[in-house]
Amino acid sequence: MAWLHKHELYWNPRIDPCDAVSMWDVLEHMPDFPELLANVRRWAFLAVPLFQTVHHALQSRHFRPDEHCWYFTKDGLIDVMDELGWRLVEMTGIETMLGRDQIFSFAFARR
């Protein structure tokens, strides 16, 4: 980080606006993700584990209460993002098809 600061390349996502953010396997770990997304002007690219039900989450290998702050269903994530001013542009399960069980990727655009 010192090198980034020295060369004036450090970006603080909670303070400095940007056009796009890419968060692969990150969102579910952030208690304050709405604060970060408030500084993103155009695009949010996300990959998160998705669950069908609470029971499904509790039985999943992705159930990590010491690491994960959030457990999303597909509709739950889309609804939260909608409330934060985002619209779903694309969703894919390619990561799951490639062996990353229950991981889905999303592209959201700012409304």
What is the role of each PLM region?
Residues 1-59, 66-97, 101-111:
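Conserved SAM-binding loop
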